[in-house]
Amino acid sequence: RDNLAEARALVAGEGPSALRSGDLAQALQRLVDARNGSGRSIDLDAHPPQALARPVEVVVLRTVQEALSNIARHSRATQAQVVIGTERLGAVRELVIAVTDDGTGTGGRPEGTGLAGMRSRVEALGGTLTVDPAHAPDADGSTGTVIEARIPL
């Protein structure tokens, strides 16, 4: 039922239900709270600008959702961190979304549909998405992963 209601809301142009009951920071907190546990700790440090356009909010929420889903499905991480804020690079102000984990890393595997979808949504807003190791390989060969999206404001 929830998925059907969500699909109807998206078709009607209302955006995700998570954004209809509170602001983006609250939606992100609810998402992180729902994903915490099961041997994994996720920290959230979210300071998005207050006046983001709805399409940008949707991309932020979907990017974090997919990154956390990838962590749960593929990384064997015990810790993750979601950081959202703004940076100014010269005359350009950017919204920065960084999701980092201490898991196995990508191991050079090709990009799947989840990452491709994230990249497509971010690039549609004129932004970039990078996926890199979070650190040098440890004794087990794990590198963790950092997914960073940058969207011009």
Language model: regions and residue ranges:
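Conserved transmitter core of two-component histidine kinases
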Residues: 40-47, 96, 128-132
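Helix-loop-beta hinge of the Bergerat
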Residues: 8, 17-58, 64, 68, ...
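A short, flexible helix-to-loop-to-beta junction within the catalytic ATP-binding CA
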Residues: 15, 39, 75-80, 107, ...
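Short beta-strand element(s) in the Bergerat
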Residues: 56, 93-97, 143-145
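Short beta-strand/loop element within the Bergerat-fold HATPase_c
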Residues: 79-92, 96-100
